[in-house]
Amino acid sequence: MHRQYHFVSDAEAPGYVGSQKCTCFKKAEIELLYTQSNLKEILKKENFDHFSFDYYSDTMKNEATGLTERETARRAYDIARGFVRNFDSSFENLFLYGDTGVGKTFLSHCIAHDLLESAHCVMYFSAFDLFELLADSKFSRDKTEGQEFVFDSDLLIIDDLGTELTNSFVSSQLFLGINERIMRRKSTIISTNLKLENFSDTYSERTFSRIASNYRMVKLEGKDIRIQKIFLGGK
C-alpha cells in the first residue's frame, strides 16, 4: 500500500508551522507536563528567593580548595545566577556533583524556575524518567516525540544521574543526548551523587570526556540538608 503523508499548514491547525509544532504549542505541552508532575508547586518553594546558606558550615574547609562549605555553596549559587542571567547570550552547560542532600536538586530547581518565568522551554527529568522516556520513544511507533523534547528544549535538566539502572542502552542514550545537545548548542544541566573518578566506570570514558570538555563542573559540599531540616523541625 502506498503511504500518504499530509503536511498540516499553519492555517490548518493552530499550534503547527508546516509539519512542525510551533514554540508556543511546545511550551503549552511542557506546561501541561509540569502541572501533571506537580513540579510547578515545588518551584514555588524551591527557587533563588528561598535558597539558604545557613545549612552550609562556615568553618568546615575543603583542604584542596581552601573554601568552607558555605563559600563553596555561594560559589555554586553565583554560577547558577550567572547561568540564568547569560542564558540567551552564551552557551553553557553545568555538571552539579556532590554527596546526597547537599542542594544540587534545589539549585537546579532555582534555575528551572527563573528560566520558565522568562518563557523558556525547560525539560526536567529524573535520570530514571528520562531513560524510560527514551526507551518508550525508541521502541514505540512514534519514535521522535520523546526525543523532540530531549533534544530541542532550551534547557534540559537531568537530575540524580547514577540512580537509574545502568546498562548499555542507558550509556549509549546518555552519550547521544549529551552530544546531540552540544551539537545543537542547547544547554544541559546534570546533577549526580557519583564521584568524578567513578563516572567513567559507570558510563563510559567518551561520555565523561564529552562532559569534562563542555560542562562547567560545580561541586556542592556539606551535610544532608534534608536530615538537618528534620532536626530543625522542617524549617
Q: At which residue positions do the language-model features occur?
A:
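Walker A/P-loop nucleotide-binding motif
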Residues: 90-108
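Structural motif
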Residues: 155-157, 189
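Interdomain "pre-motor" coupling segment immediately N-terminal to P-loop NTPase/helicase cores
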Residues: 1-46
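Charged, amphipathic alpha-helical linker segments immediately N-terminal to NTP-binding catalytic cores
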Residues: 29-79
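Phosphate-binding P-loop
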Residues: 82-91
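Short glycine-rich substrate-engagement loop in P-loop NTPases that contacts/grips substrate
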Residues: 61-78, 91-97, 113-152, 165-168
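Walker B catalytic acidic pair
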Residues: 160-161
